[in-house]
């Protein structure tokens, strides 16, 4: 993990599920400290490492923490940090959830670009895990897998019974396509006929047509899309954020189909159990 940021930066916004407005401050830290959250609104300001062992829940978003101190919807920010090779960072949050912003990683990318990044010493840079044997996690017809590969690449497929999305596949090779243009702009998405049910369950309180793409069976309610295949690109963004809990992204070809945060984090745990 080769970089931290040059100066602190602050971003404000509303959490997707909590509906609570929070302030996030990213602060540079010394080499070797890693990426970690700090709930500055709670007594003793508890620290929550951005690490697999702290995964608490993975239903519709990824939540880290322990009883009394959690942080939710961390995946878009963490995807940005790992894509930029920012490995040492304190993330101060004054609420229970990282704000959704526009539903993509673009706002994080823009904010970090304004302050810039600086490299750590070469001695402190660790090497990524290299996958040598296939690993798979599956639930019914959904799966996510890691296969040996000479480079790191991602292939993701989705299949929804909604005409605007339907079947989509997308492959991303970080060496060939820039995260900032290919992945970061892809926004979270949802379905009009599920909104009321999710809100009754206490979820998506902060969701709106300003921070998420929404479709019904026939059309998008808030076009235009940033890519024709924006939904599957966003799923790949989520996968990247969940795999970041390993530290560096392993060298592998990651293949996912109809997967979820739960399957993503299960694969990350299987990789950790196998190679650490």
From Swiss-Prot:
One of its GO terms (molecular function) is UDP-3-O-acyl-N-acetylglucosamine deacetylase activity. SUPFAM superfamilies: Ribosomal protein S5 domain 2-like. InterPro entries: Ribosomal_Su5_D2-typ_SF, UDP-acyl_GlcNac_deAcase, UDP-acyl_GlcNac_deAcase_C, UDP-acyl_N-AcGlcN_deAcase_N. It catalyses: a UDP-3-O-[(3R)-3-hydroxyacyl]-N-acetyl-alpha-D-glucosamine + H2O = a UDP-3-O-[(3R)-3-hydroxyacyl]-alpha-D-glucosamine + acetate. This is UDP-3-O-acyl-N-acetylglucosamine deacetylase. The active site is at 261 (proton donor). It is an enzyme of class 3 (hydrolase). Zn(2+) binds at residues 76, 234, 238. Pathway: Glycolipid biosynthesis; lipid IV(A) biosynthesis; lipid IV(A) from (3R)-3-hydroxytetradecanoyl-[acyl-carrier-protein] and UDP-N-acetyl-alpha-D-glucosamine: step 2/6. Its EC number is 3.5.1.108. The gene is lpxC. Belongs to the LpxC family. Its cofactor is Zn(2+). Keywords: Hydrolase, Lipid A biosynthesis, Lipid biosynthesis, Lipid metabolism, Metal-binding, Zinc. One of its GO terms (cellular component) is membrane. Catalyzes the hydrolysis of UDP-3-O-myristoyl-N-acetylglucosamine to form UDP-3-O-myristoylglucosamine and acetate, the committed step in lipid A biosynthesis. GO terms for biological process: lipid A biosynthetic process.
């Amino acid at each position: 993990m080769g970089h931290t940021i040059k100066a602190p930066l602050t971003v404000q916004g509303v959490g997707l599920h909590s509906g609570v407005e929070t302030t996030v401050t990213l602060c540079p830290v010394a080499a070797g400290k890693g990426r970690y959250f700090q709930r500055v609104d709670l007594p003793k300001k508890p620290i929550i490492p951005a690490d697999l062992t702290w995964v608490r829940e993975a239903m519709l978003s990824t939540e880290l923490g322990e009883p009394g101190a959690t942080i939710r919807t961390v995946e878009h920010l963490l995807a940005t940090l790992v894509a930029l090779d920012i490995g040492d960072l304190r993330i101060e949050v004054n609420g229970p959830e990282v704000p959704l912003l526009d539903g993509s990683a673009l706002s994080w990318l823009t904010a970090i670009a304004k302050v810039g990044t600086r490299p750590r010493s070469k001695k402190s840079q660790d090497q990524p895990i290299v996958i040598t044997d296939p690993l798979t996690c599956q639930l019914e017809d959904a799966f996510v897998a890691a296969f040996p590969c000479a480079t790191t690449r991602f292939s993701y497929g989705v299949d929804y019974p909604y005409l605007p999305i339907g079947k989509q596949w997308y492959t991303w090779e970080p060496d060939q396509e820039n995260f900032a243009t290919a992945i970061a702009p892809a926004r979270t998405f949802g379905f009009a006929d599920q909104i009321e049910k999710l809100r009754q369950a206490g979820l998506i309180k902060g969701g709106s047509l300003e921070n998420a793409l929404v479709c019904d069976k026939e059309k998008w309610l808030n076009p235009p899309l940033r890519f024709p295949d924006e939904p599957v690109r966003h799923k790949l963004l989520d996968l990247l954020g969940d795999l970041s809990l390993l530290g560096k992204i392993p060298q592998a070809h990651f293949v996912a189909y109809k997967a979820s945060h739960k399957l993503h984090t299960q694969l990350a745990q299987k990789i950790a159990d196998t190679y650490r």
